[in-house]
Regions:
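Positively charged n-region of N-terminal signal peptides that target proteins for export
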Residues: 1-4
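Boundary at the C-terminal end of the N-terminal hydrophobic targeting segment
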Residues: 18-20
Length: 152
């Protein structure tokens, strides 16, 4: 009876130590994630459910800035073209961590004039991949992250 109890205590201590070590790295990971997205362009493609092979579309997002606010909350400011105007639109978003991998979570976010969006997007290295929903339409998205060239 004592032997299993000792094993459980040892495993608990190891798990607590690993969790503490991971928590210690979180601020550096968050800073690196903010730096990667600030001034970046995400270039890739997206698909529509049921039409993956037929309707793969080119996709591009320009990120002006990425800032952590409090807890899991971030503000991602993206350039968006609405009609003839190009605007910097701040989007309140949650970022959760799966080990060293950030995952953006956006649920039922309404952008006036564009509609309501839900997305889950994972970032690793210079790649991103995820799912999206806009009203009745939804699908997958994926691509590469690179720095936005400066305008001359």
């Amino acid at each position: 009876m004592t032997r299993p109890l000792i094993g459980i205590v040892v495993l608990s201590l190891v798990a607590a130590t690993l969790w503490a070590a991971d928590t210690d790295k979180r601020p550096q990971r968050e800073q690196a994630f903010a730096a990667k997205l600030t001034g970046a362009t995400m270039t890739g493609a997206f698909s529509l459910d049921g039409k993956q092979d037929k309707n793969q579309k080119e996709d591009k997002y320009q990120i002006v800035s990425a800032k952590k606010t409090e807890g899991d909350n971030w503000v991602i400011t993206a350039k968006m073209k609405i009609g003839e105007n190009e605007l910097d639109v701040p989007i309140a978003i949650k970022v959760y961590w799966a080990d060293d991998t950030p995952v953006m979570s956006l649920t039922d976010f309404t952008i006036p004039g564009l509609g309501t969006f839900t997305a889950r997007v994972m970032f690793y290295g210079d790649r991103y991949a995820g799912t999206w929903q806009h009203g009745e339409a939804g699908g997958h998205m994926w691509g590469l992250i690179g720095k936005t060239p400066e305008k001359k």
